[in-house]
Amino acid sequence: MAPYSVVASVLAAAPPQQSGSVRQLPSTINRAITQRSQSRHVASASSASSPTTMLEERDNLWEIGGPYWWPFSSFTPPAHLDGSLPGDRGFDPFSLGTSWGQPPVDVSDPNYDESRLRWLLEGELYNGRLAMLAVVGVLTVEAQGKGPWWEIPGNLNLFGTPYVVAVVGGHLAFALLEKKRLENFRETGEAGHFGAARFDPLDLTEANPLGTDYNRQAEVRNCRLAMLTFLGFSVQAWVTGKGPIENAKDHLASPFEANIFTYGDRGTNVVAIFSAFAAVMHIAELAREKKAEDKPRSRNRTLSGSS
């Protein structure tokens, strides 16, 4: 899929189009954002020294809706998500932001927890960018009639080089690039790409009149959409044995005869697995919120008992 990487890079770098000026959020949402910002700790780093992946203006959201992914306004986001990261909707039901991941910085660093969140964001962006490239490659391969996308890699012959040799060479090249990314993160707080901690060779960030925050939010949205899309492609391949374009044609031709429930146990199992995961995720969020509410109460009881 290497010949399509240039096209994919352009698509990945371009922010989604939006007609007219950016709409202001409703007053109720503005109030929710104000309350959210006041209830969270203030970031210590200035915008000049912060990584370019951080928002210049906290809670600078373009999505219509509140700053919290949970549909009930009475719930509050986790304390470690302070709105300074792009795409921050308070989504961390399993509290991974406080325990998951080991950033390449000293554990004794006073900003270690902030580095962890930035490191997790780098992981999301990196996987999302790969997913955007993969989605374009999957669709292009099938649109050209070259067969299912999962069968293509083993049949490729890149410039007369056997596929295995190309894979080994690619891994060695990426190992060097990953080493540079780690060094960049230690020095600047972001990893970047191809040796640059701020990878923007076409200056698309500065060229967008909507501002850098819009670009950062747009990239995170596109990354998440691409990761979900590629997951859908993979599930389709396992359930139906067909590519996304062929599946779409079959479903549009006969919606009631070609859908996830008409492919036997595999389709039913997929629905059951995703439904169970969604239920566990919401239960975990309820438990996290309940725990957050109990902490102040316990502290108040302790203070009243000692006085």
UniProtKB/Swiss-Prot annotation:
It comes from the Eukaryota. SUPFAM superfamilies: Chlorophyll a-b binding protein. It is found in: Plastid, Chloroplast thylakoid membrane. Chlorophyll a 9 binds at residues 236, 247, 258, 260. Chlorophyll a 5 binds at residues 64, 127, 178, 181. Residues 34-54 are annotated as: Disordered. Chlorophyll a 2 binds at residues 81, 86, 90-92, 124, 224, 274. Chlorophyll a 4 binds at residue 146. GO terms for molecular function: chlorophyll binding. It is a multi-pass membrane protein. Its main location: plastid. GO terms for cellular component: chloroplast thylakoid membrane; photosystem II. Chlorophyll a 6 binds at residues 52, 132, 190, 198, 200, 204. Homooligomer. Component of a light-harvesting complex (LHC) consisting of 11 chlorophyll a-b binding proteins. This is Chlorophyll a-b binding protein 1, chloroplastic.
